[in-house]
Amino acid sequence: MVQVELDVQDCFLESSPEAAQASGYIDSQVSSATWEDWFHRWLEILDSSLPPAPSYEIGLRLTDDTEIQAINAQYRQQNKPTDVLAFAALEADLPQNPEMVAEPLYLGDIVVSINTAQRQAGQQEHSLSTELAWLTAHGLLHLLGWDHPDEESLIAMLQQQVVLLDAVGIKININY
């Protein structure tokens, strides 16, 4: 059984409770327990692509367009908001150190803009929680080394996201 320690930081709610209430985010907010359940199920599905470890650690930061734009500018030289950023801790195959195998393996951080997710949910005509799950699953795949430099790999990644969402009871229609 795959174990995951998830650190959820809801900076969107913390920084602007009024905006969160006005936008309807509070009604669509995903609980920490739900996030943990989703990540646990997703990592069970993706187990064959996980490096060996007794457990895994992931950071999830929910934020706004202003913060994600600053992060995007700093790390990707793209001075604009985006929907999701993933910062993988394991960019290369690491040699197996017996001492490291005894500790949780840090996979990286996922940052999601609630503002952008809300816009995209409206465009896709599904709920904000569905869009958050979609974006977070996308970020998780990036943490595990998935990428989409071409159409074929993008389609494979999107198909895997559909599988991940289906595993947590979320049905989504995506046009490839």
UniProtKB/Swiss-Prot annotation:
A Pfam family of this chain: YbeY
Known EC number: 3.1.-.-
Gene3D superfamilies, per the entry: Metalloproteases ('zincins'), catalytic domain
A GO molecular function held by the record: metalloendopeptidase activity
Main location: cytoplasm
UniProt-listed InterPro entries: MetalPrtase_cat_dom_sf_prd, YbeY, YbeY_CS
UniProt remark on cofactor binding: Binds 1 zinc ion.
Record flagged with keyword rRNA processing: yes
Entry-linked SUPFAM superfamilies: Metalloproteases ('zincins'), catalytic domain
Cofactor(s) the record lists: Zn(2+)
Annotated family: Belongs to the endoribonuclease YbeY family.
Primary role: Single strand-specific metallo-endoribonuclease involved in late-stage 70S ribosome quality control and in maturation of the 3' terminus of the 16S rRNA.
Name of the featured protein: Endoribonuclease YbeY
Provenance organism: Trichormus variabilis (strain ATCC 29413 / PCC 7937)
Lineage: Bacteria, Bacillati, Cyanobacteriota, Cyanophyceae, Nostocales
